[in-house]
Amino acid sequence: MNHRTWMSLLSLGAFVAQGAAWAQTAGAMQQKVTGPQARYWLGAETASGMAMPGMGGGGTAETGGGLGAMAGMMGALMSGGGVGAPRKSLRLELGGVRTGNPSEARHTVPTALAMGESLSLLGPEKGTPAAERPERDVPEPPDGKAKGRMLFFWGCGERAGPGQPVVLDFEKLSQGVLPPDMRSNINLRAFRQGPAMGRDAGYADWPNRKNSKTVPSQASLVGDHLVQGNFVPDIRFAVGGAHDFMEALSLKQAKATSGAQQLQWNRVPTALGHFATAMGFKQGAGDSADIVFWNASSTKLLGGEQLMGYLPPAETERLVKARVLLSADTTQCAIPAEAVAAAGGGMTWINLNAFGPELNVVHPPRPEDPKVTWEQQYAVKMRLRSYTGMLGDMENLSAQRSNKADEPASRTEEKKEPSPTDQVKNALKGLFGR
C-alpha cells in the first residue's frame, strides 16, 4: 500500500471519528424536559365599534362563547358609553395534570386591574361532558333546495385582482360539483391548543357560571400576578407595559368614486399586523341570493375567518411577509369595487383584527447545563389582540329589506317553511363566524 493510499485512509478515518464525536456530542446536548404540571392561558382583548362578543376569540362553548366580552358590552351600555365604546375582556384558562374534584383556583390580580383582590376560577360541574367544537367546512345546502351563490374576493385595492371572484353555486354543490379554484394559495398553521375540559385532568376557568365581572375601561394588567389552586402549583408572573391591554381600534369607511369601499383606521402601538374581512348579501331573482365574502389578503385566501382570533407573533410575522396580513404600519385598505357591486352596492358587515404580542413564562427557567433535566412546574401564555366591527352600507341594506317587504302578501303567507334563501344563510352558520 503506497503512501498516498495510507494518507487517504487516515483522512477517511479521521472524518468518520469526527462525525461520531459530533453525533455523540449532539446526543449529549439533548436536554430532557418534563412537565409542565400546570398551564395557564390568558386572553386579553380590546373591542370597539360593533365587534361581536367572542368573535373568533377566546369565547368557548363552556361559557356561552364570549361571556366576558358580552359583560364588557353590557358594562359599556350601562355606563352610557354605548355599544361603540371601547371595552376590555379577559379569558382565564387553567389546566393541570391532576384534578381537584372540583378544580378551583384564585388569581390574585394587580390593583391596576381595578377588579378587586382576586378572580375565582372554577371547574365544570361533575358529569358535564366536554364541549364539542364543530369543524368548519363548506356547508351542504339542506335537501339540495337552496338557491344562491357564495362569491369570494380578496386583496386591498379599488379593483379586484385576476381570478376573482371564486363562485360556489349551491345548486351545483347539491349535485356534488365544486369549482376547481376553491383552494387557497396559503396554508394556515394549526397551533398547540390551550387548557380545556377533557384535554387536562384538572381544569378551571374565568368567567364561569358563578363568577363574572365586567372589566373596567381603565383596567391594566401591569403588575405582579399570583395563581393558587387545589390542583396546580403556585403560579407567579409579572406583566409589563409592553403586554398590557392593547389600544382600541377606530374604523372608518367611505365610498370611493370608483365604487370601492375605503377603510381607514388608527395605528395601535403594540399591533404586529392586521386582518380585515367583510360580508355582504344581494337578493337575486325569486328565492336566490348571493353571499359575498372579502378579506384583505393579497395572497388568494377564501374566507379567512380563522384569522379573526389570536396569532403567535412568529406566525403574524410569517403571514405579513406572505402578504396575507397587513403590516403593523398599514392603516387603510380598499374593498374592490367588484366585491361591493356583487353585494348590491355595499358590504353589510366589516371586521378588523389587530394581532398583538404574546407573553410566555416558564418556571423554573431552563437549566444552562444540558445534562440537567428541565422539570417545568408551570407555563404561562398571555395573548393579546384588539378588534372592531361595523355595519357597512346601511342605505343599501335598507333598500334590499324594503324590496323584500314589497313582495305580495299572498306570496309571503304561502311560505310556511323557511325559504331556500334562508336555508342558504342557515347553512352558512359556523362557517365564517359564530
Where would I find each of the regions flagged by the language model?
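Solvent-exposed N-terminal domain segments of exported/luminal and surface proteins
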Residues: 30-208
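Bacterial N-terminal signal peptides
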Residues: 8-18
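Short, aromatic- and glycine-rich surface loops/edge beta-strands on solvent-exposed regions
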Residues: 211-235, 345-359
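Proline/serine/threonine-rich low-complexity linkers at boundaries of modular beta-sandwich domains
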Residues: 233-245
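Hydrophilic extracytoplasmic domains
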Residues: 264, 270-434
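Bacterial N-terminal signal peptides that target proteins for export
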Residues: 1-9
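Structural beta-strand segments of beta-rich domains
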Residues: 259-263
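Sec/Tat signal peptide C-region and signal peptidase I cleavage site
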Residues: 19-23
